[in-house]
Amino acid sequence: MASACGAPGPGAGPGAALGSPAPAWYHRDLSRAAAEELLARAGRDGSFLVRDSESVAGAFALCVLYQKHVHTYRILPDGEDFLAVQTSQGVPVRRFQTLGELIGLYAQPNQGLVCALLLPVERERELDPPDERDASDGEDEKPPLPPRSGTSVSAPLGPSSPPAAPEPPTPAVESAPNGLSTVSHEYLKGSYGLDLEAVRGGASNLPHLTRTLAASCRRLHSEVDKVLSGLEILSKVFDQQSSPMVTRLLQQQNPPQTGEQELESLVLKLSVLKDFLSGIQKKALKALQDMSSTAPPAPVQPSTRKAKTIPVQAFEVKLDVTLGDLTKIGKSQKFTLSVDVEGGRLVLLRRQRDSQEDWTTFTHDRIRQLIKSQRVQNKLGVVFEKEKERTQRKDFIFVSARKREAFCQLLQLMKNKHSKQDEPDMISVFIGTWNMGSVPPPRNVTSWFTSKGLGKTLDEVTVTIPHDIYVFGTQENSVGDREWLDLLRGGLKELTDLDYRPIAMQSLWNIKVAVLVKPEHENRISHVSTSSVKTGIANTLGNKGAVGVSFMFNGTSFGFVNCHLTSGNEKTARRNQNYLDILRLLSLGDRQLGAFDISLRFTHLFWFGDLNYRLDMDIQEILNYISRKEFEPLLRVDQLNLEREKHKVFLRFSEEEISFPPTYRYERGSRDTYAWHKQKPTGVRTNVPSWCDRILWKSHPETHIICNSYGCTDDIVTSDHSPVFGTFEVGVTSQFISKKGLSKTADQAYIEFESIEAIVKTASRTKFFIEFYSTCLEEYKKSFENDAQSSDNVNFLKVQWSSRQLPTLKPILDIEYLQDQHLLLTVKSMDGYESYGECVVALKSMIGSTAQQFLTFLSHRGEETGNIRGSMKVRVPTERLGTRERLYEWISIDKDEAGAKSKAPSVSRGSQEPRSGSRKPAPAEASCPLSKLFEEPEKPPPTGRPPAPPRAAPREEPLTPRLKPEGAPEPEGVAAPPPKNSFNNPAYYVLEGVPHQLLPPEPPSPARAPVPPATKNKVAITVPAPQLGRHRPPRVGEGSSSDEESGGTLPPPDFPPPPLPDSAIFLPPSREPLPGPGVRGRSGGEARALPPPKAHPRPPLPPGPLPPGTFLGEAAGGDDRSCSVLQVAKKLSEVDSAPPGPGRCLLLPGPLELQPARALPSDYGRPLSFPPPRIRESVQEDLAEEAPCPQAGRTGGLGEAGMGAWLRAIGLERYEEGLVHNGWDDLEFLSDITEEDLEEAGVQDPAHKRLLLDTLQLSK
């Protein structure tokens, strides 16, 4: 039996002998998903392993494979520390002293398990030999600290502890640092007996022990004398009178000869030293107070000084006008916009031809909205309030996109400063990370604090504006904690005149994180928590690990993680494991959310540090690319980007585009040379230049966060790493108010679920339930077990809950705050109560009188484990729905610039007039264009649903794409990608591009839905229907005899997939649209335009068998399982992306009766590493100009495509980039261009200038 199961017989389990190794079938810290994967590889019935339980501390989980399904049994300890397999009610319980006994019994047949335990699945071997240290690439190695306390030391295998044995303790005398151990040993060996005899004879002292102590402390006499002598000199600086006792002791040359007298003298000296130290402090204090009383009055304390005032900033702009306006006002006008943040005013100064000036002043409350242009990165629309609540919009062209961003930041700061709200809607956060190389920092680190240097930096007019929160993460920081904190506070005070308050400081070895906030925010911070995790050998030794801080800012939770991961080019897998260990073991945030890892526990989580991911490229190629400032090829081989694409680390995290050179490994004292050679005893070590120092973040869905800068300094050269900075604009919520104090008659909000369906990556066939957590709930709620489940594939399980199984949730918060709340869901099994996946759903889009759809992914322990969708509604009384516009919603993105010239500007989304509820939609509206279907704001439906709360404006894309200078045109024929939602995180987005064949089935209509008439600037978009029998899941092997073998781990056909890349809306023109009732919006209103295709879409999956090693359970080539769970589903539904033929429109078929889902990232099916290129054209214009549909009549002017065609026609296409960059992007505006304007755009040749002007004159 022992040979079969790998365990000793009863009574001889691993816990019976303390030094025995752990049995092969036991896997410490193995996740449930990894256990199922190991068993799937084993592939034989009766394969088993034992792992730690994820739900109960001290318990175990026995996993058994039978008929390709994994069965899990919980092994629980009882009150007497016996172990027993959890059984159904009425089944007798068998108790065991050790796991070995338990496994030995159940290895026999017919013992109550699904099958006997036959084949133990052993642990995988370590990726790296245990003797290899982290600092394999030459980083400074710190001496390892002793292990953690005994609570974390492995215990022997027994009823309640994992099977491992601790090392026997080393006697203390062996580690004693001085010679006292020898003296003690001699006394105990010889003189001890003499003292014992003396005591027995009636002696009252121990002469031999006294002599031993006196001999041991003899050197201390001279040391105390030296200290007393030095302190006496220091004392005379403040007081001329010296201490007579100290003088007498120092003049005493001959110490007593007897041991007892010698000890008495030493004790006297120590007593005098203690009093002398305190006396010196009192003398110094008195002397300094006397000096200050005679000195002139001291200035006001710096802590009471206000922050430096922000000077008035001026911006040179041009007024962007239409051709019709130009005929009235003549030449294009130039303005100076002066922003007075302190005074709350914006002054528009216009210079007239006769040198006169005309200016208009607008107070902060009369600036209603800022509208950023997608097409022109330096163009901004400003909506001003005129008399009688009328508004006027003016469009300005700034010198550069960076100036436009600075102007927007100043106006937001002005709005915030003069807001009537008691609590802020938005704060700014600075994140800094720096590996200091075990060297003290230079005196001046201002460039780090002010985000100056290389990459995406702040404009000079905004760098001095203090941030609300500063977070500094350092590695290899040899400065003491208090000294480091004082250095940071001093630097910030010198820079801002503010005394920043330290909120938290956490250290692990030389890894530190410090958080400082403005004094005005100190009372808004609560629930501060700190934690640390060691990731060295056995997660105990070494100098690598992570520290973290979390807190609440009013009602918004923040988490910050600073880490130092394993170094070495070849240690990618170990770095990945470091990340997963930190994710699982770092204890931060609300303890009630222990079922969720820290990536889901916070509204905003920032993760930064020396991640140590390297570049997989030859050193000379890397240096060549860096010298040419070409970073795109290097980012393609960046290990962190590659691992994120494979969904192995930082799942759904975001990172701003990298536009600065690698920050490691520089020659100390310079930023001109990379020191990529390191001489070591084992040979020469190569450290290729790499972006080791990174800042990433992850935020809850429908929250506001924008990265304003991401770069590194170029003037701090003490370390071989450059400091990295990032600044963020983050939306925050007010402190929530409990509803318990309200009257009982007050209307109550509640959350109802109609149905939920989850696809879970598992080979188990157990039942499941859902737990619901939220700060708006008094306690967590749970559903009943699912009432339906099915599986078309062995490695995926679809589970469903109807409304009868789902609870009704009753929030305890005031209704106004619900739109800022989120629900956290975890899907757990009934057999082991272990989580199979967690997710977050925002309530903002769910508020309304009708049910709304959500769809999002599930993850567990940092790995993607499936997805979940459902129908729910958050019912809120209309009269109590909070609709206050947030400050960050004040800036929006112009989505329809072509039509904006002829329409009155919208002041804000929340203030739009609702559509009349009496008008019945026309039949054609059922299949109208999707121009409104996936847009953020909703108009109230005829059913009387209250208007949805306003959302934040979409955030602008990075200003400069990789390898493309500012102002460079996009490639012709390639549409620009849509803008990212301002809820700028990849954890949530409106569902777009979902293949129709995977949406809920609907009875076919006998007649094709009529094509709607095109509205202004909109185009009908449809997706051809699939021909029956054409779309089959691709087969893994042609010769497979069973469905399960041929399917591998393909998901079931109705697996709800992530949205395809936007290019999937362009399909071959040969297929016919599916007859159906058409497309409907969320509330039966207008449809909305789908976004255009990505500028660089991924190629579709080629037909034929999928590559081997892609799916779970198959032998992969190497250990790279890069295909994520939801990519598996995507591969089943990938479609061709050829553009439509001439004259053909794309129609989306009818089965969109379900409301559009709202909880998936817009880039769900593509890697998150590389931000899309710059947006050059609005969504509707792209579709209107590029889709040759007869319904899509154009009303806007020619865009960039028209400009390019005109320049090519006259042979001057070389000037297109310069003209567009300077705002001349439309032929309608060119009629007013002058020679001066042409020169500014780069046209210097007189002949070319004359040709351009003559051609424009002829075209009038």
From Swiss-Prot:
Record domain SAM: where: 1198-1260
Catalytic activity: a 1,2-diacyl-sn-glycero-3-phospho-(1D-myo-inositol-3,4,5-trisphosphate) + H2O = a 1,2-diacyl-sn-glycero-3-phospho-(1D-myo-inositol-3,4-bisphosphate) + phosphate; 1,2-dioctanoyl-sn-glycero-3-phospho-(1D-myo-inositol-3,4,5-trisphosphate) + H2O = 1,2-dioctanoyl-sn-glycero-3-phospho-(1D-myo-inositol-3,4-bisphosphate) + phosphate; 1,2-dihexadecanoyl-sn-glycero-3-phospho-(1D-myo-inositol-3,4,5-trisphosphate) + H2O = 1,2-dihexadecanoyl-sn-glycero-3-phospho-(1D-myo-inositol-3,4-bisphosphate) + phosphate
Skewed-composition ranges (Basic and acidic residues): 126-136, 953-967
Regulation affecting activity: Activated upon translocation to the sites of synthesis of PtdIns(3,4,5)P3 in the membrane. Enzymatic activity is enhanced in the presence of phosphatidylserine.
GO CC, any one term: basal plasma membrane
Comp. bias (Pro residues): 159-171, 940-952, 998-1013, 1050-1061, 1090-1108
Sample GO molecular function, one term: phosphatidylinositol-3,4,5-trisphosphate 5-phosphatase activity
Tissue: Expressed abundantly in skeletal muscle tissue.
Pfam family, one: SAM_1
Top-level taxon of the source organism: Eukaryota
Record-linked SMART domains: IPPc, SAM, SH2
Domain SH2: 25-121
Segments carrying motif NPXY motif: 985-988
Keywords from the UniProt entry: Cell membrane, Cell projection, Cytoplasm, Cytoskeleton, Hydrolase, Immunity, Lipid metabolism, Membrane, Nucleus, Phosphoprotein, SH2 domain, SH3-binding
Residue numbers carrying Phosphotyrosine: 888, 988, 1164
Chain span(s) of sequence motif SH3-binding: 946-951
Reported modifications of this chain: Tyrosine phosphorylated by the members of the SRC family after exposure to a diverse array of extracellular stimuli such as insulin, growth factors such as EGF or PDGF, chemokines, integrin ligands and hypertonic and oxidative stress. May be phosphorylated upon IgG receptor FCGR2B-binding. Phosphorylated at Tyr-988 following cell attachment and spreading. Phosphorylated at Tyr-1164 following EGF signaling pathway stimulation.
Domain remark from Swiss-Prot or TrEMBL: The SH2 domain interacts with tyrosine phosphorylated forms of proteins such as SHC1 or FCGR2A. It also mediates the interaction with p130Cas/BCAR1.
Function: Phosphatidylinositol (PtdIns) phosphatase that specifically hydrolyzes the 5-phosphate of phosphatidylinositol-3,4,5-trisphosphate (PtdIns(3,4,5)P3) to produce PtdIns(3,4)P2, thereby negatively regulating the PI3K (phosphoinositide 3-kinase) pathways. Required for correct mitotic spindle orientation and therefore progression of mitosis. Plays a central role in regulation of PI3K-dependent insulin signaling, although the precise molecular mechanisms and signaling pathways remain unclear.
Annotated PANTHER family: PHOSPHATIDYLINOSITOL 3,4,5-TRISPHOSPHATE 5-PHOSPHATASE 2, SH2 DOMAIN-CONTAINING PROTEIN
Name of the molecule in the record: Phosphatidylinositol 3,4,5-trisphosphate 5-phosphatase 2
Gene, per the UniProt record: INPPL1
